[in-house]
């Protein structure tokens, strides 16, 4: 568990704190996932929040003074969506509420955008952070900062009942030239399909999660890919479709890719990210988040996997 790893890393962080000060303060101008950002991330993840007791500044101070924040979501159940009353809920917004409350920010509002517009919307200042269960990877970490993960989960396909084409993973799509698969634009599944060699004419890209499943219902696509939990949520809400078994996609070297989600921040808001991360880690180590996350259908092991990892582990 990361709780043990955290204690070990805290010892290193204290010993190296003077050497890391300049690195941590200057590591965000280019947004790159380089050694500077990794060092800053490790310091923020593992120093237990001991930043000398100084007052917050920048965006964090503004949010604390206002007591409210706007987060970006993509209306994807169960990760981040609006309920029937128009209130933001889901795994990520509810975890964010709990963590932000510990930072003195009690009101969480949401802006709904297409998944592929989350990063650009954050960068443009449309909202203050991303709380959409976004997977952490090196490509995205070149554009924004991430927290440590709060869940890790596999992939699955939604297919018509009986799975008439026998689809089970991306390689099975390659092996079935007549199959067309729906993928959420900007999601990691685009990359998974590319690595597997799925031809572009077998892929339909969508900006909206529900539209993918509407087209599956109508027979316009043969499968929808997504996290196993997204697929299961949709399958349980619709007639005539089923989920394949969960699987982990493969990278260029044939190694399984572990999909882990976290929270996104602008590159110039490292102080905010660091404070959020410290509070997140504390609540993970204390077991305060597991009921929130499993309440949205995640398994306990999905939460426990994430506790063993940091953002640096996922971005290289």
Tell what function each PLM region has.
Residues 97, 108-172:
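Acidic, polar ligand-binding/catalytic clefts
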Residues 152-156, 237-277, 300-316:
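Periplasmic-binding protein-like
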Residues 70-78, 88-103, 155-213, 223, ...:
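Bilobed "Venus flytrap"/periplasmic-binding protein-like clamshell domains
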Residues 26-58:
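Short, low-complexity, disordered segments immediately C-terminal to signal peptides
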Residues 134-142, 192-195, 222-257:
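A ligand-binding cleft/hinge motif common to bilobed small-molecule-binding domains
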Residues 26, 93-102, 163, 187, ...:
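Extended ligand-binding regions for polar small-molecule ligands
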